[in-house]
Design a protein with these regions (language model features):
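A cross-family phosphate/adenosyl-ligand binding-site feature
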Residues: 36-133, 168-173, 178-225
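Intrinsic-disorder-associated, low-complexity terminal segments enriched in Asp/Asn/His/Tyr and depleted
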Residues: 8, 18, 29, 33-36
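Active-site/ligand-binding-proximal alpha/beta "capping" segment
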Residues: 125-162
């Protein structure tokens, strides 16, 4: 099995630090920099995983985004990990923007009113909206829909198609963070390593691996301060 440190070595942007500060410390740091608040898109599914650890991490992420003064953007459903993440953010008084295609029925939309609900026609339009209106992206452990969203961001970063919220070109791309709980994304990272080794991928495309909710903000805070 490939260990965590090997991925941290391969992806230059990844941190190899083993120690993670406590959530309170990171949130305090976030609160001191409210002028640097972000729109953070969370990619996750409308299903609940078998692992309660993943579901609890989704709730922690929603709370952390709200407490940091950031805005949560997500796929608009009240089901599964989408509901866990957005519900936790709403309970903390956070701003939550749901982006949902019109072909989904109304009964999957959040029962607690979100701050803003954006209706789009297709899944492609949802991804386009999230990429255009977000400063950073976090993927919880997820299925093929989540992987599709991750790869969409990576392709946009690699091709230089990403723009900031003002519409200006953002040549350095936007951070795409994988929450790699328990090594969930290790096989995916290994495949990307092979792709890059074969010369079929030019860069890390903004990909960052984090190992806890605390680690996400440890890695995002220096980026937003810049």
């Amino acid at each position: 099995m490939i260990k965590r440190c090997e991925y941290d070595t391969f992806w230059p942007i990844l941190s190899s630090a083993d120690s993670t500060p406590k959530t309170a410390a990171i949130l305090a740091d976030s609160n001191e920099n409210r002028n640097n608040t972000m729109n953070i898109s969370v990619f996750c599914g409308a299903s609940l995983p078998h692992s309660e650890q993943i579901t609890e991490a989704a709730r922690q992420l929603g709370r952390a985004i709200a407490r940091g003064g950031h805005t949560l953007l997500y796929g608009g459903s009240n089901l599964g990990l989408m509901g866990a993440t957005s519900g936790a953010a709403l309970q903390e008084g956070g701003r939550v923007v749901g982006v949902i295609p019109t072909f989904f029925s109304d009964d999957i939309i959040h029962s607690q009113p979100v701050s803003e609900l954006v209706r789009v026609r297709t899944l492609a339009e949802r991804k386009e909206y999230l990429i255009a209106h977000s400063d950073a992206f976090v993927a919880l452990p997820g299925g093929i829909g989540t992987l599709d969203e991750v790869l969409e961001v990576m392709v946009a970063n690699q091709l230089g198609l990403v723009r900031d919220r003002s519409g200006a070109n953002q040549s350095q791309g936007k951070p795409m963070i994988l929450l790699n709980l328990g090594g969930y994304y290790n096989p995916f990272l290994e495949q990307l390593r092979l792709v890059k080794e074969e010369g079929l991928m030019r860069s890390d495309a903004g990909l960052i691996s984090a190992y806890s909710v605390e680690d996400i903000f440890l890695k995002l805070n220096p980026i937003v301060k810049d």
